[in-house]
Amino acid sequence: MTTENRPAKIIEAHEIMTLLPHRYPFLLVDRVVDFEEGQWLKAYKNISVNEPCFTGHFPGQPILPGVLILEALAQSMGLLAFKTHEIKGGELFYFAGIDDARFKRPVLPGDRLELFVEVIKERRGITSFTGVASVDGEVACEAKLMCARR
């Protein structure tokens, strides 16, 4: 990943909501801090003590469910896809698959989940990515993901 001394490409929350169909409580990307079309994207999600999932996962010891970390990576992947391709009306990028998901540390209230996705390959409307979610530079989750354009 290189930015070649260019200004960061930022996507604010209001634009994220024009690109992704997700809404509270399932909009899991707060801000994109940089990206390179067709290559990679860096974003983050601030984890609040008020996340709805914490009422049951787990009472008294809240931990962000791994499936929501994967969904945040998938939404980051979708944002990169939307910023890379010219979109026809009503077209979406669907989460199509996941491989080799690994969870390495818990994500807790107060953490800032840093999201990084990078394109591996693209063919026939299917794009493969690697995704890494980290907190304070420590990997929390990594996986290979796929999305399909429909």
Curated annotation (Swiss-Prot):
Belongs to the thioester dehydratase family. FabZ subfamily. The active site is at residue 57. It catalyses: a (3R)-hydroxyacyl-[ACP] = a (2E)-enoyl-[ACP] + H2O. It holds the Pfam family FabA. It is found in: Cytoplasm. Its main location: cytoplasm. The gene is fabZ. This is 3-hydroxyacyl-[acyl-carrier-protein] dehydratase FabZ. InterPro entries: FabA_FabZ (IPR013114), FabZ (IPR010084), HotDog_dom_sf (IPR029069).
